[in-house]
């Protein structure tokens, strides 16, 4: 009797919670241009698919006063339901402060994880948390924001972020999908 009830419960659970595979809900082939406030920074980011669920990342930010934060690495992405994606990234940063060196002063690694969710039609909410790892001084990085997708190729966003280098900023961005 218990075996029959277990089989019925398992069948019912499988019928209610289908384990169908979904494609990614967001495009990870994109180019972004951004401007941050307090301190004023300009930056950009490019991501492109390596496989269906992995992508390469390259990003750079600067105050244009002899400084930069350049990062590159690889990330994963995949669906977390019908309207959301989960993603993560492993990056290597080269950070240059105001010194005269040709190459940046510091090399750091970053590991992060985040999610992107369709809140309404053409409105995306996203969040990411990570760690900028240094032997002496590791820092938490985060990004919370919203993005309006005006077309399939163009979206405009506003984020509250701290990338671990420039501190807390309000960032406005334009993203172009390809």
Range-by-range predicted roles:
Residues 1-27:
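Cleavable N-terminal export/targeting peptides
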Residues 21-64, 69, 177:
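Short glycine/proline- and aromatic-enriched beta-strand/turn motifs that initiate or cap beta-hairpins
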Residues 26, 52-58, 79-88, 119-127, ...:
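Repeated loop/turn-to-beta-strand initiation elements of outer-membrane beta-barrel proteins
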Residues 31-37, 58-62, 88-94, 127-131, ...:
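Transmembrane beta-barrel strands of outer-membrane/channel proteins
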Residues 38-42, 66-70, 105-111, 138-142, ...:
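Residues that define the transmembrane beta-barrel architecture of outer-membrane proteins
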Residues 39, 64-66, 80, 94-100, ...:
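Gram-negative outer-membrane beta-barrel proteins
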Residues 48, 76-78, 115-117, 148, ...:
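Residue-level signature of outer-membrane beta-barrel architecture
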Residues 72-74, 142-155, 167-178:
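Outer-membrane beta-barrel "beta-signal"
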């Amino acid at each position: 009797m218990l075996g029959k009830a277990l089989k019925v419960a398992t069948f019912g659970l499988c019928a209610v919670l289908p384990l169908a595979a979904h494609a990614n809900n967001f495009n990870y082939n994109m180019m972004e241009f951004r401007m941050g406030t307090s301190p004023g920074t300009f930056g950009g980011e490019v991501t492109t698919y390596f496989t269906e669920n992995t992508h390469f990342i390259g990003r750079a930010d600067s105050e244009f006063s002899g400084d930069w934060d350049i990062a590159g690495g690889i990330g994963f992405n995949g669906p977390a339901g019908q309207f959301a994606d989960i993603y993560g990234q492993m990056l290597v940063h080269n950070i240059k402060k105001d010194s005269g060196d040709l190459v940046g002063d510091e090399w750091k690694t970053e590991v992060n994880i985040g999610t992107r969710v369709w809140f309404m039609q053409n409105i995306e909410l996203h969040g990411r948390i990570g760690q900028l790892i240094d032997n002496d001084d590791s820092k938490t990085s985060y990004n919370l924001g919203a993005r309006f997708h005006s077309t399939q190729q163009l979206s405009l966003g506003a984020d509250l972020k701290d990338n671990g280098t420039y501190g807390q900023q309000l960032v406005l961005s334009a993203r172009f999908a390809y």
